[in-house]
């Protein structure tokens, strides 16, 4: 088997051609071939997470990254490959444990593309017989990898001006000094620490601190502009204790040791901003960030990078509002100092967060449980809910006139009237008696449990009506639907209103105060003005039998009038079950008749008669009804489900259908069934078509094979996401989902796989794994491998390119996620074929950022969509983007209400060598192929689908837990001993279609 043309990549390879490592034998490709019919290896480009890639792009200058083999998934280590290094990179190196090999490359010749027959005789794929690779992943390093440099800026599209909520920060040259702070006795509260340091500065600024005003992070670090008059010094500060009512108590002494650690200046920062240095000076950025956060940290409630306070609304009444059930929201803002092309910028955005209402605990319980009569004992289930929601809250003690406070550790299992405790003289007394005698207070709600403070071994019991929840305590539990609606309604702002709120915040916060001036910082009050481009929408192809065969969307929208699905599915076996008790008996028949008529009118083939007669069943018997349908109609293609009138059964239905019976289902709300609305039926028809194997539309350029770096070679586009449990669910696993396109060149059908992993683990663990099989021993497995096998089965092709859209990764995790997940991808590829190294473009998709783009002229219909937001297709890759790396903001959708949030795409690896225009156009065009509606969507569909699939799998897990179905679940143990409840397997026929839509 020939390896000419470059199978491996990485370290020591020569240009694009079939270069061979000097230490590599010529017959190194003798392993068992796992892709039957494949006679030659497929070229990938060098370095995996490209040790040699520097910024990993075609012809893009010199690599300055020096990555070790233990940190980077180098393909030669995985596949023994040779071939391409980084194309056009003049120099690159890979450091191994023993030596560093440097190779100079100037070859520009494109290697020949190996052709693969589209019809292959044997599609069964077996495991390789080579010795299995170690599955331990390389260690993560936050600075191990440098990412691709920007391949120039995009030029396509209509140029427009927009404003962004980024404010230019100018910094004068200063020497910055870092001091370690040690406060004794140690306290957990940042607030107390800050109060100690404020008093220290007040008392000693002129006498001992050389007149300097330091910036303090609330923990261990103090920063000054210029040196203090000492290297190390200890101070004594007497801080008056603050009572719960705000008054001052007795003084408490603190010893504060301040010791010089290091100093820096702004030279490295300027070098980075001038693009003369690759490594960002994060230590310097941290100092400046602490300076800008110093004042708000003292004045407001700090939550991550956000600040909240009731004074941050338009007026005193606007700063807070009720969400229901004893919860309220506070207005606030997000603040982050960022490195951008225009220099340092301060990203400011308005925000809101949920807090506990500062009310008496009995009032809270009345709201939280929606009960009026507090003279009755709580049910056990309600008592547990109250215990969970109140635990760790701080309360004022009203029988001490609010001067004392305590922390709730739990609530009693018995009503307070039944609680007794033993006195020092060994006599017993009830809590009710104690409060009557000690405080002359008669407990009002004696049927309620008592608030417990202190430990379980030495509990202190307090009547609920004498405990008032302290103000400013964050509510971290999941908001219910009513609360979410109330929060959205209160915080939803149209673009001009949001922009004005942001401007007012910047003025109110006065970032140019004395402390900022001392550090040489000044912040402009004007939003950044940026040149953006509006990319043209793609032409969409529909079936030739429709009146309209092609559509050019306008402002991110179109409709299905006179159009037919490009590939209508054929449904020959279907039926309907209704679990609603409120709809008329004959309505399911009429609804299904009209729904099927809609499906047929849009291009599907649908047998009019159901496989078995429709079933009506009370919601208490969902499982029995579904099992009966499966027994009476084996091989059912589609089950239309009319949901129960009360919410809560959707997850159970999906779990049973998709993991136990192998039934594809379409659930419909009874209120929608009642309406018989045509638009609703059209939307449902779109979902049914893709769930039964059809395609609604495709990009015309895909049909014409006119998408650069996609349609020229077999390409698989993948989306990946990890969803985490809600706060408070401490034992629930995180769920990873990976979807992959199964049709090339159309790239429209996405197969979905899911996997459970350790609680709040962001890195996807099951992309590649070795599984111990009782008969076969160690067997290659994992999500990537399974998708690749399915791709070949569906297309007869082997992917030569991978476009991997990864959702849900924060900036601090970029290197770690790339290193681990690229290692897994390379191992999965190598398990299918030695030296099989397809080229990978790895793109992070971010929606949870705070950059907002506003039209230059609000109300100008030529510059906005109908909602007043910037137009769909607006892309920004200048000024507010990274100074060096390949990233861009793309607003691909039309706004509905409020202010649109553009998606942020950041390229971590690009072995395919996309230009800015190519990747931006591809991403924008894909946003028009989302299957569930005739609108462009806000993030690229593969990432969107991965999110939907992971969210669907959460139902499987939640149903398992809520139904007590332990017999169905499996568990495994991680390397650190954590037991993970495994997801029930999705049936094969279900996961072959877009079941999650």
From Swiss-Prot:
Detail which positions bind a divalent metal cation.
721, 807, 947
Q: What does this protein do?
A: Involved in RNA-mediated post-transcriptional gene silencing (PTGS). Main component of the RNA-induced silencing complex (RISC) that binds to a short guide RNA such as a microRNA (miRNA) or small interfering RNA (siRNA). RISC uses the mature miRNA or siRNA as a guide for slicer-directed cleavage of homologous mRNAs to repress gene expression. Associates with siRNAs of various sizes, from 21-24 nucleotide in length and preferentially recruits small RNAs with a 5' terminal cytosine. Probably involved in antiviral RNA silencing. Associates with siRNAs derived from cucumber mosaic virus (CMV).
By its UniProt entry, which Gene3D superfamilies does this protein fall under? 3.40.50.2300, paz domain (2.170.260.10), Ribonuclease H-like superfamily/Ribonuclease H (3.30.420.10)
Where composition is biased (Gly residues), the residues are 1-16, 43-59
Q: Which PROSITE patterns match?
A: PAZ (PS50821), PIWI (PS50822)
User: Where is the region Disordered?
Assistant: 1-144
Using the record's annotation, list all stretches that form the PAZ domain: 360-471
Q: Which Pfam families match?
A: ArgoL1 (PF08699), ArgoL2 (PF16488), ArgoMid (PF16487), ArgoN (PF16486), PAZ (PF02170), Piwi (PF02171)
The answer on whether this UniProt entry bears the keyword Protease reads no
Q: Which keywords are on file for this protein?
A: Magnesium, Manganese, Metal-binding, Plant defense, Repressor, Ribonucleoprotein, RNA-binding, RNA-mediated gene silencing, Transcription, Transcription regulation, Translation regulation
Which residues are in the Piwi domain?
Answer: 638-958
Composition-biased stretches (Polar residues): 116-129
InterPro entries noted in UniProt: ArgoL1, ArgoL2, Argonaute_Mid_dom, Argonaute_N, PAZ_dom, PAZ_dom_sf, Piwi, Piwi_ago-like
The beginning of the lineage is: Eukaryota, Viridiplantae, Streptophyta, Embryophyta, Tracheophyta
Gene label: AGO5
Q: Name one GO cellular component term.
A: ribonucleoprotein complex
* UniProt-recorded name of the protein: Protein argonaute 5
The record's disulfide annotation reads none
User: What cofactor does its activity depend on?
Assistant: Mg(2+); Mn(2+)
- Domain of life from the UniProt record: Eukaryota
The UniProt similarity line reads: Belongs to the argonaute family. Ago subfamily.
- Spell out the molecular function terms from Gene Ontology: metal ion binding; RNA binding
Any one Gene Ontology BP term:
RNAi-mediated antiviral immune response
SUPFAM superfamilies for this protein: PAZ domain, Ribonuclease H-like
For bias kind Low complexity, which ranges apply?
Answer: 93-106
Q: Which residues does the annotated region (Interaction with guide RNA) include?
A: 847-848, 893-901, 930-952
